[in-house]
Amino acid sequence: MKTLIARHKAGEHIGICSVCSAHPLVIEAALAFDRNSTRKVLIEATSNQVNQFGGYTGMTPADFREFVFAIANKVGFARERIILGGDHLGPNCWQQENADAAMEKSVELVKAYVRAGFSKIHLDASMSCAGDPIPLAPETVAERAAVLCLAAESVATDCQREQLSYVIGTEVPVPGGEASAIQSVHITQVEDAANTLRTHQKAFIARGLAEALTRVIAIVVQPGVEFDHSNIIHYQAQEAQALAQWIEKTKMVYEAHSTDYQTQAAYRELVRDHFAILKVGPALTFALREAVFALAQIEQELIAPENRSGCLAVIEEVMLDEPQYWKKYYRTGFHDSLLDIRYSLSDRIRYYWPHSRIKNSVETMMVNLEGVDIPLGMISQYLPKQFERIQSGELSAIPHQLIMDKIYDVLRAYRYGCAE
């Protein structure tokens, strides 16, 4: 990460896409997409997804590392080219506890990530815990971030410190997109970004972390990008120029969250304006979902009724029976909630892919379609971009490859934005 940031600060147009997903097909796509390039791939886990207690994936940081490396071995991607990151490392999962208890768990969380070899660490202590004022004072956020940084430094080896990089900042959009309709978004003001940096510098120095400050590579800000279930707030470069000019006076870049669904031209503008780390998650699993739905429609027409997977019906039934991952985000009312379950840009389906019933139905669908020749006309109907690539000889009409290429469409836009 440090080399890439140094190149950006030296004037090169270069950035990196941060893949925030634990879905094996998304990780496989990210690695396979760059297999024949010289670029490194940044894959990040969030604190609620992967933590010392297992998170909602059931994986510790060490488990997640081995999970990613196993996929890399399968793809033929050198693990030395993988950068592992930890996102929102702090009290996020334990906000219902008092600050002392939550921070104690957060310290162990950060240590677990660093011990597992994660080298990009987002120190995020911005969330209020039980009994805390809402919002927290910037000084409190910075002091807690310094405690987390001290934890990271205490377990990092000398070799790890050479690679270790930190991201600070509190102005993060709702992880995974907004829960309600949006029309506009507040862009971070320069004075707020400057105050974030100033308070963190003071807190780090007070804890003897002056050297660790040199490892802070980025500040999280809101450049004016966001999405909800069916709306996208697109990047307006002219609105972010004050931010772009301010960061040029520092040795850092910006990290932009919720950049999903922007145009490839917007990604290029974001990187030009020093938002050099672009995080993406739901857009990748949304593309996966589109591919699975398309293949399910194809299966519906090609496979005998008694042999079909019933994939779409299974997904719908499981999500209606177990609504904990979407209920507080989606609209009420049967019809509206069904539309959101299927098509929301927030893509809460991503939490359900590991469910045994859904996993089994998708596997059945894939086996069914691997055993037949899919007519080109059907691929044109349901996956038109992939049809064009089959026609040009770039792609085969194999279900797995069709899913991969659908995810590649998202990665292609980021590559256009980030490539030197």
UniProtKB/Swiss-Prot annotation:
InterPro entries xrefs: Aldolase_TIM (IPR013785), GatZ/KbaZ-like (IPR012062), GatZ_KbaZ_carbometab (IPR050303), TagBP_ald_GatZ (IPR023436)
Keyword Translocase part of the UniProt annotation: no
Pfam hit, one: GatZ_KbaZ-like
Xref: SUPFAM superfamilies: Aldolase
GO CC aspect terms: plasma membrane
Gene3D superfamilies: Aldolase class I, putative tagatose 6-phosphate kinase domain like
Keywords, in A-Z order: Galactitol metabolism
BP GO annotations: D-tagatose 6-phosphate catabolic process; galactitol metabolic process; phosphoenolpyruvate-dependent sugar phosphotransferase system
Pathway: Carbohydrate metabolism; D-tagatose 6-phosphate degradation; D-glyceraldehyde 3-phosphate and glycerone phosphate from D-tagatose 6-phosphate: step 2/2
Family: Belongs to the GatZ/KbaZ family. GatZ subfamily.
Assembly with partners or alone: Forms a complex with GatY.
General function of this protein: Component of the tagatose-1,6-bisphosphate aldolase GatYZ that is required for full activity and stability of the Y subunit. Could have a chaperone-like function for the proper and stable folding of GatY. When expressed alone, GatZ does not show any aldolase activity. Is involved in the catabolism of galactitol.
The protein, known as: D-tagatose-1,6-bisphosphate aldolase subunit GatZ
Annotated organism of origin: Escherichia coli (strain SMS-3-5 / SECEC)
Gene: gatZ
